[in-house]
Amino acid sequence: MLLHAPSRRRLLAGGVGLGLVAACTPRTGAGSLRDLTLRVATFKGGLQTLLPAAGQANTPYKVAYSEFAGGNLITEAINARAIDVGTMSEIPPVFAARPNTLLRIVGVIRGDVNDQVTLVPRDSTATRFADLKGKRIGYVRATTSQYFLLRLLQEQKLTFADIQAVALSPQDGLAAFGRGALDAWVIYGIDSTLARVQFGARVLTTALGRLSGNYLAAALSDAIADPLRRQAIADFLGRVKRAYAWSETHPDDWAKLASAATGAPISIYLRQRKERSGPTTLGPVAPDAITSMQAVADTFAKAGVIPAPVDTRPLWDESFSAALS
């Protein structure tokens, strides 16, 4: 639902160019919150739509939103010092887990896994994932889509060499699936529902039991180190937590707002909510989330998706627990 209202997250606004990083480095030092601008990464129809609706937009600091097409791009922007805070799944930080990374995970969002699916065309003869051996399967690189596909392959004792894996953006994947260029598509969010509605796609598998459903709130380490910016991040996270709670009790209102922001029909959002595996909540860093992301990293390393094993534990920052409890 909310995490993938974004998932027209395929729409990347040009507001944050990584070539302008030097000019985007946050200022530090004395001052007041009213003089501070918190740089927040979001998706189309995301936090910039939700917080005002939930009555959480009256911040004592300014907020500059930049829309991104995916959590992998938000991860890159944080590491480029272009963003102070943003959200993504537990997958992108694995690819950024290196000693000099600037990304820190400050909270855990528990979300839906039923909107992460393997789709096949309506006339496909496939009845189980094993039937897709040798077939053209679309996925989104460095996202839950790639990890989900790897898990499905491992269940059948297959590897990426046993399929024709096609890395595509969600936008390109939807178009390719619609014109019959894919035999299956491993995808998430609004696009998965759109493919079912527009093209009659059939769900072959869901991610229930295969993905954790953990998403992450992450921040720039430089911003955390600055007292004023840290204060703004803590306040903003609390507002996001309350806004998620509002969306749970106002599903019809949220569906209308998300639809207006993204152009996807209201019915798509209501259908997503009806089919989801659980509510969306934001809470503090938790041991199970730390363990889960390390397991993702270990799985990717063993499969050769990343070049070497990585320790993801240094990415976690538990100092915002009070703001999220």
Regions found by a protein language model. Name each.
Residues 101, 158, 264, 305-306:
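Helix N-cap/coil-helix junction residues
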Residues 91, 171-260:
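Pocket-lining segment of extracytoplasmic ligand-binding domains
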Residues 22-23:
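C-terminal motif of bacterial Sec signal peptides marking the signal peptidase cleavage site
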Residues 31-159, 164-167, 183-187, 209-211:
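Short, glycine-/small- and polar/acidic-enriched structural segments
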Residues 1-19:
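N-terminal secretory signal peptides and thylakoid transit peptides that target proteins
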Residues 297-325:
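Conserved C-terminal helix/tail region of periplasmic/extracytoplasmic solute-binding proteins
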Residues 227-305:
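Secondary-structure end/capping motifs
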Residues 76, 80, 94, 130, ...:
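Solvent-exposed, polar/charged alpha-helical surfaces in well-ordered, non-transmembrane soluble domains
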